[in-house]
UniProtKB/Swiss-Prot annotation:
PROSITE patterns reported in the protein's UniProt record: GIY_YIG
Family that this chain belongs to: Belongs to the UPF0213 family.
Organism of this sequence: Photorhabdus laumondii subsp. laumondii (strain DSM 15139 / CIP 105565 / TT01) (Photorhabdus luminescens subsp. laumondii)
Xref: CDD domains: GIY-YIG_UPF0213
Protein name (database record): UPF0213 protein plu4503
Domain GIY-YIG intervals: 4-79
InterPro entries, sorted: GIY-YIG_endonuc (IPR000305), GIY-YIG_endonuc_sf (IPR035901), UPF0213_domain (IPR050190), UPF0213_GIY-YIG_endonuc (IPR022992)
Pfam families to which the protein is assigned, alphabetical: GIY-YIG
Length: 104
């Protein structure tokens, strides 16, 4: 993966909480979260499960997509995980426009 290629991801905790983040290296970041060296909100909440990931373009675009996902309700995030959309940007746009969504 190129250094400037960002990934948006969702992790699920043992209690069912969904955490949204972005990274350039999903394997490294997941290991950091699992070892308690990632986000404070995930410490002690394991085991963690990677439930969604999608390429998100550059850092700016990834940050915008991350913000949009974080604004979704838990139900909408769970639907995102179930649908596993091919393009996260299109998926989020369809939610804003009230349209149905294509999945993988």
């Amino acid at each position: 993966m190129a250094e400037n290629q960002w990934v948006l991801y969702l992790l699920k905790t043992k209690s069912g909480m969904l955490y949204t983040g972005i990274t350039t290296n999903i394997h490294r970041r997941f290991a950091q979260h699992e070892n308690g060296k990632g986000a404070k909100s995930l410490r002690g909440k394991g085991p963690l499960q990677l439930v969604f990931s999608s390429y998100a373009g550059d850092r700016s675009n990834a940050s915008q997509l991350e913000y949009q996902v974080k604004q979704l309700s838990k139900q909408q995030k769970e639907r995102l995980v179930i649908c596993q959309p091919v393009c996260i940007a299109e998926y989020l746009a369809s939610i804003r426009n009230g349209q149905s969504v294509r999945s993988k």
